[in-house]
């Protein structure tokens, strides 16, 4: 049953950007200028010009950030919270924290989908750094019910279920312990570009509750929830700020990986965000088959625009299959069994037509967020959302700390 024949049917004539690797396949709007350059390249250029830290300022801003974090934690057991998935970005932030004398509480959300490799990478990092580690094990039956609700709803961003729980736990632990800084591993070299319609706002509780109310089958008793208004409270009242250390350095991704391999015995994954078996399957099977989305295009586009690889190299990488036949069969069987679905039941869900998140109720702020994306006034994506939040809410990000 693990057949990658796409259900998604693209109606537009095929065209690929002349500068990056984004194309017309998928639910996203895309436009090209006279030179064949897409609107996402122009949006990236705008974001870099407006928000990127000039190379000559990076060192001082990095040192300011480290100093402010250390000062805030004086007399406390920890000076920051760091969410660790075992992926390259959060792992490298752990390395930077170790090298610069920070005392983070490492927080990990165990949603029962960790790959064996991710578990080993996290274990190696904790052992090498000596950092304190808090592993939040989410109730699997509730979490499974949430994921199945999103699958049955046929919305695109099933990862909302994981991502919003991670945000919630990070803020809850920081506030509980009086910690004022959360370290994020968002990386402008690989997470700046995300086409409109490929994801959704991670903290829209109205949307989440509506989806679960219609398609969920269990009452949520312990699943951690944090909406947009909670997020505002943590920033503005509790005084918790985000720091993205990877915005203050200019280290190529291959060099980051080499450092992690040397320092921690870290090992790389199949593709970006494949620390989770479900995310690996979601990106490699659900998204391309049902929605026409190959997220590698966005991640690799950022590497092209950052000068990490050439466009020709990027095209060659995209020509590589996401999965081998054996890997796909293994993940397909594992995921369907874990969800308690037969292959036929799962494929019936896959065959349902895609439904936009906007077909369900939205928080007012979530609606405005989505509207701005459609108007092209902000760049979609996890990284950009939190990059702008940091710029407006953290003195560090404005360079005034």
Residue ranges and their predicted role:
Residues 1-80, 96-401:
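Nucleotide-activated chemistry modules centered on ATP-dependent adenylation/adenylyltransferase
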